[in-house]
């Protein structure tokens, strides 16, 4: 497909860019490939910055970026490290767990939840909301799933508006307080905008990190030489994290809307139609990545597109990398003989075609005492 038709049409006529170069070329021309028509193939734009073009997108991004500065992310390192150890403490004596349910899912939800003013006892509720809301962003949503999503959004909306009001009255040091007070060129976020941008942060910060952590760890366990290599040389961890991101590509695709007729990588495209960017396919492009089907923690260079490219490059990439690094380092050190319950098993995936990853990953290891 990538070699013969870099931009192809599926059976429904939807155009899709499958090669690394085609995806990059589209992202370098936001004036031709617009976000403003919505990033899903069969849904209109939502009032959040991911569905905007500059200058509106740039202003919104500057306002939200106040909560994701390098210093603010660095300041969270100690608390995230402690959280990783707490999660491992909860399972280390058992000798078995579900890696997704017990480690990969709770970590990003706790981190993002803390930033959004979520108390520990509310995290499971937020995790359900996040899962239900992501389901809506997949194509072909049933009426039942649509209602579940609407109920989740209504509950999230009520919670977030109450949190916003509380932070306006009595600011703390959490992300909601930062966003409430953020100002660029005299502009501030309205309550409606705060609800939508924190929702984007919730979805973007929860499922993506969860799926990279679980899917990347699966590859380390299925490629035992790579696991052993990391244990012998922990300095290779940064490269391993990048390979986990390339391999899992948790955001599978996004759409752009054509603003004019054009021919693009051999395919005629019409103004007003959508073209899908296949990030996962681009991350396995043989023209860019040597032996792309090989999981290699020493891969260099590794210019993957897990965080996108261009003006919409993922704002939370530093936070995601920090979470992935801190948890993976601790899993390697504290659960050194971690292994899949069944090496030859096919693990279940979440039924989604936008943000997707492992639903469950049973693992076993030698029991050990908790740190706490």
UniProtKB/Swiss-Prot annotation:
Induction statement: By cholesterol.
Pathway(s) annotated for this protein in UniProt: Steroid metabolism; cholesterol degradation
Binding site for heme: 314
Top-level taxonomic group: Bacteria
GO biological process entries: cholesterol catabolic process
Segment forming the signal sequence: none
Cofactors, names only: heme
MF annotations from Gene Ontology: cholest-4-en-3-one 26-monooxygenase activity; cholesterol 26-hydroxylase activity; heme binding; iron ion binding
Entry keywords, A to Z: Cholesterol metabolism, Heme, Iron, Lipid degradation, Lipid metabolism, Metal-binding, Monooxygenase, NADP, Oxidoreductase, Steroid metabolism, Sterol metabolism, Virulence
Pfam families associated with the record: p450
PROSITE patterns: CYTOCHROME_P450
Catalytic reaction list: cholest-4-en-3-one + 6 reduced [2Fe-2S]-[ferredoxin] + 3 O2 + 5 H(+) = (25R)-3-oxocholest-4-en-26-oate + 6 oxidized [2Fe-2S]-[ferredoxin] + 4 H2O
Family: Belongs to the cytochrome P450 family.
Classification via PANTHER family: BIOTIN BIOSYNTHESIS CYTOCHROME P450, P450, PUTATIVE (EUROFUNG)-RELATED
Function: Involved in the utilization of cholesterol as the sole carbon and energy source by degrading the side chain during infection. Primarily catalyzes the sequential oxidation of the terminal methyl of cholest-4-en-3-one into (25R)-26-hydroxycholest-4-en-3-one (alcohol), (25R)-26-oxocholest-4-en-3-one (aldehyde), to finally yield the carboxylic acid (25R)-3-oxocholest-4-en-26-oate. Also able to sequentially oxidize cholesterol itself, not only cholest-4-en-3-one.
The protein's name: Steroid C26-monooxygenase
Organism: Mycobacterium tuberculosis (strain CDC 1551 / Oshkosh)
């Amino acid at each position: 497909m990538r070699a013969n038709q870099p931009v192809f049409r599926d059976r429904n006529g939807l155009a899709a860019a499958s090669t690394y170069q085609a995806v990059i070329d589209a992202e370098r021309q936001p004036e031709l490939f617009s976000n403003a028509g919505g990033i899903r193939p069969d849904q209109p734009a939502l009032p959040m910055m991911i569905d905007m073009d500059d200058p509106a997108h740039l202003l919104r991004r500057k306002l939200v970026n106040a909560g994701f500065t390098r210093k603010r992310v660095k300041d969270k390192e100690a608390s995230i490290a402690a959280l990783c150890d707490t999660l491992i403490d909860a399972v280390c004596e058992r000798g078995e767990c579900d890696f997704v349910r017990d480690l990969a899912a709770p970590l990003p939800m706790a981190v993002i939840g803390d930033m959004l003013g979520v108390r520990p006892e509310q995290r499971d509720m937020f995790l359900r909301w996040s899962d239900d809301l992501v389901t809506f962003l997949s194509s072909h949503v049933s009426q039942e799933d649509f209602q579940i999503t609407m109920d989740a959004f209504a509950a999230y909306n009520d919670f977030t508006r109450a949190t916003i009001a509380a932070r306006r009255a009595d600011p703390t040091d959490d992300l909601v307080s930062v966003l409430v007070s953020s100002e660029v060129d005299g502009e501030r976020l309205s309550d409606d905008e705060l609800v939508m941008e924190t929702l984007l942060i919730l979805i973007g910060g929860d499922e993506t990190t969860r799926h990279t952590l679980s899917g990347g760890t699966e590859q380390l366990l299925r490629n035992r030489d790579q696991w052993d290599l990391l244990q012998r040389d922990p300095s290779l961890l940064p490269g391993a994290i990048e390979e986990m991101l390339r391999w899992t590509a948790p955001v599978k695709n996004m759409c752009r809307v054509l603003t004019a007729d054009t021919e693009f990588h051999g395919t005629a495209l019409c103004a007003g139609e959508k073209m899908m960017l296949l990030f996962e396919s681009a991350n396995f492009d043989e023209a860019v990545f040597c032996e792309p089907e090989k999981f290699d923690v020493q891969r260099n260079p590794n210019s993957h597109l897990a965080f996108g490219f261009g003006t919409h490059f993922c704002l939370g990439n530093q936070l995601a990398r920090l979470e992935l690094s801190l948890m993976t380092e601790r899993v390697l050190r504290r659960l050194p003989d971690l292994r899949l319950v069944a090496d030859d098993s096919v693990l279940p995936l979440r039924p989604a075609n936008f943000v997707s990853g492992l639903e469950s990953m049973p693992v076993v290891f030698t029991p050990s005492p908790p740190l706490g």
